Amino acid sequence: MDTKKLAALAAAVRLGSFTRAAEELGYTQSGLTHMMNSLEKDVGFPVLVRSRSGVRLTPAGQRIFPLV
């Protein structure tokens, strides 16, 4: 698994926002979204719930997040 994707996941969860995580990491919001979609494809299940108010871990994401 790509360490850049894991770092992006950690930032998105910590900041609660793809936009803020992308700004912090120097990516576009669209690029970070693509990274998260790719990460979810890699692991085979959704790890984030996306909403207008931000992002948070799914129950499955909560189980794997400590490994990040």
Locations of the language-model features?
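The N-cap/first-turn positions of alpha helices
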Residues: D2-K5, Q29, G61, V68
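Short alpha-helical "packing" element that flanks the helix-turn-helix/winged-helix DNA-binding module
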Residues: A8-A12, I64
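Short helix-boundary/capping micro-motifs
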Residues: A11-G26
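Short glycine/serine/threonine-biased micro-segments
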Residues: R14, T28-Q29, R52, P59
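Helix-turn-helix DNA-binding elements, focusing on the entry/boundary residues of the two helices
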Residues: S17-F18, M36, R50
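Core residues of bacterial helix-turn-helix
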Residues: E24-L25, M36, V43, I64
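A short LG(V/I)-centered, amphipathic sequence patch enriched
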Residues: E40-L57, Q62
